[in-house]
Amino acid sequence: GESLDEAVHAVERAVRPHAQVELIGGSGPTQVAPVDHPAFETLRRVTREVLADAHVAPYVMNQATDARHFHAVWPHVYRFTPFHMSKAQRESLHNVDERITRASWLEGVRWYERLVEEA
């Protein structure tokens, strides 16, 4: 990750001299969660069991989520959702008429039940 200062300087370099950049607020990057940790293996195992056609792999998340607040209680925070969603459903997230199918919801509930049982 990069710091807020580094991000501001990169934007400043891109827009100078046409605009000024002012940081109003923000938070820096969070720690990278290791994939060689038992918690990640539990996610992988439960996912293979409940969502047989899903793949579990690390990825870069370039936006802030509420998960950043969880680092105060646990250093390894994995951002994961066990819901199958169509492109239209993903685009509806945090918008009017946000939705997933009933089947996807129930499958996600089953995934969370198994995760709690494994924890």
Residue ranges and their predicted role:
Residues 1-113, 117-119:
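Metal-dependent amide/peptide-bond hydrolase catalytic core
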